[in-house]
């Protein structure tokens, strides 16, 4: 897991690519979702050294890295993520990406964690289907049907970034 301090520049760039006027079906945080998601995209794009999309581009993925279409999923957190933290996407979305990167974003937007990454084909093999209305042991209740893996199921982004023999070695 890679911890990242959020800078004012990152916040500014996230506001530029987010669209606060759009509230997508099945998002978890209402109109804030665009900004939260954009901030997660900025974190991953900066780490990978690529450019994220802008708010008029691409539904199926957020950026391209090493010929892989990357979709970033960001979750607002009140505490740093752990190995057992959920990484999920709602079943509503049918995005056509090659890889998912998962980011945990501290509620005050001061820090983020790139929790890991996984090829989309492997995500759906490993993910558990969680039905709307299911309540976790910590009291959180899912508002939508979700596909869920844990942080421990993801590949380390440091290993993926340093790998020169092909991504399949680590994913």
Q: Where in this protein do the model-derived segments appear?
A:
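Nucleic-acid endonuclease domains
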Residues: 1-66, 73-171
């Amino acid at each position: 897991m890679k911890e990242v301090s959020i800078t004012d520049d990152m916040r500014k760039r996230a506001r530029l690519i987010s669209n606060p006027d759009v509230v997508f079906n099945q998002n978890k945080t209402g109109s804030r979702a665009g900004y939260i998601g954009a901030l997660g995209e900025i974190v991953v794009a900066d780490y990978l050294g690529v450019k994220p999309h802008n708010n008029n581009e691409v539904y199926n993925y957020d950026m391209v890295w090493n010929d892989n279409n990357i979709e970033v999923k960001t979750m607002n957190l009140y505490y740093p993520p752990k190995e057992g933290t959920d990484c999920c996407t709602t079943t509503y979305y049918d995005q056509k990406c090659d890889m998912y990167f998962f980011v945990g974003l501290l509620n005050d937007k001061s820090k983020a964690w790139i929790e890991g990454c996984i090829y989309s084909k492997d995500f759906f093999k490993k993910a558990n289907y969680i039905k709307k209305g299911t309540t976790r042991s910590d009291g959180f209740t899912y508002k939508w049907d979700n596909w869920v893996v844990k942080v421990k199921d993801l590949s380390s982004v440091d290993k993926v970034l340093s790998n020169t023999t092909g991504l399949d070695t680590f994913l």
